[in-house]
Amino acid sequence: MSSSRYEPSWDVDLAPLLSCKLCLGEFPLEQMTTISQCQCIFCSLCLKQYVELLIKEGLETAISCPDSACPKQGHLLENEIECMVAGEVMQHYKRLQFEREVLLDPCRTWCPSSSCQAVCQLNEAEVQLPQPVQCPECSLRFCSACRADCHTGQACQEMLPITTFLPGENGSNLKSQEDEAPIKRCPKCKVYIERDEGCAQMMCKNCKHAFCWYCLESLDDDFLLIHYDKGPCRNKLGHSRASVIWHRTQVVGIFAGFGLLLLVASPFLLLATPFVLCCKCKCKRGDDDPLPT
């Protein structure tokens, strides 16, 4: 009778785990994705969510590496993006790319009709000057500079609200319908912005310019939203009075907190300044002294 000893098997997969810089989790290599331009590596789920968020929010057309300290400042290639997002998300991304190309091309512009949105070609020889443009799709004639009805021989009225209009509309009824227009153009970069409902304080995703939806006045420096307390836009913000007061209380509290912090820290700064200056002078004097021979 022969007996054999049982020898346990220790064949364990000892493949190293890699750390994701976004979620700080550790994953095997097959669950990670490497960006080809910079060789930064992230878990596939985090990178997919990051890319989808930027595309859906329309924040970027060139999607950069999510690592803010990336030494090469790499960007994801189009084929890399296409491999990780759904088909409809990729179509939206390509649409954003096309809109960006038209925006940066001085020889192309968008038809201002909200029902058309075709791309119109400008005369390259006169691209720096206002010129009449006719849409190839809806035949609407408009000015390339102010986007209003074609006004050959007359100066552009730059102060008119920048709203979209339908074919056949003229300037008289455009002014009366400007508040109800669902689509307007950013007064700074001229891109289209659509508003369904809600707050009248708008921020352009393209240039980050804050403005009033009704009169297009800049709100970049109006932290307390005083604009909606007087004038034609009074009480048109779209929020209750209580929520506006709460917003202002928060803003004032933030500024007051910074002021109080500066007030408390100022005596310590005054006391520390002479010591810092003395240390700097001493270090400089030590550098200037010749080495002993």
UniProtKB/Swiss-Prot annotation:
Q: Which Gene3D superfamilies match?
A: 1.20.120.1750, Zinc/RING finger domain, C3HC4 (zinc finger)
Reactions catalysed, as given in the entry? [E2 ubiquitin-conjugating enzyme]-S-ubiquitinyl-L-cysteine + [acceptor protein]-L-lysine = [E2 ubiquitin-conjugating enzyme]-L-cysteine + [acceptor protein]-N(6)-ubiquitinyl-L-lysine
- A Pfam family assignment: IBR_1
What SMART domains does this protein's entry cite? Answer: IBR
ZnF IBR-type: positions:
91-156
E.C. number, please? Answer: 2.3.2.31
Q: How does it sit in the membrane?
A: Single-pass membrane protein
- PROSITE patterns for the chain: TRIAD (PS51873), ZF_RING_1 (PS00518), ZF_RING_2 (PS50089)
Q: Which GO terms describe its cellular component?
A: cytoplasm; Golgi apparatus; membrane; ubiquitin ligase complex
* Keywords in alphabetical order: Membrane, Metal-binding, Repeat, Transferase, Transmembrane, Transmembrane helix, Ubl conjugation pathway, Zinc, Zinc-finger
Give TM segment ranges.
251-271
**Where do the annotations place Zn(2+) 1 binding?**
C20, C23, C43, C46
Asked if Transferase is a keyword of the record, the answer is yes
Detail which positions bind Zn(2+) 5.
C212, C215, H227, C233
Molecular functions (GO terms): ubiquitin conjugating enzyme binding; ubiquitin protein ligase activity; zinc ion binding
Alphabetical list of CDD domains matching this protein: BRcat_RBR_RNF144A (cd20366), mRING-HC-C4C4_RBR_RNF144A (cd16777), Rcat_RBR_RNF144 (cd20352)
Active site, renumbered:
C199
Known pathway: Protein modification; protein ubiquitination
Protein's job: E3 ubiquitin-protein ligase which accepts ubiquitin from E2 ubiquitin-conjugating enzymes ube2l3 and ube2l6 in the form of a thioester and then directly transfers the ubiquitin to targeted substrates.
Give the similarity note: Belongs to the RBR family. RNF144 subfamily.
Q: What is known of its domains?
A: Members of the RBR family are atypical E3 ligases. They interact with the E2 conjugating enzyme UBE2L3 and function like HECT-type E3 enzymes: they bind E2s via the first RING domain, but require an obligate trans-thiolation step during the ubiquitin transfer, requiring a conserved cysteine residue in the second RING domain.
Output this protein's name.
Answer: Probable E3 ubiquitin-protein ligase RNF144A-B
Its ancestry begins with: Eukaryota, Metazoa, Chordata, Craniata, Vertebrata
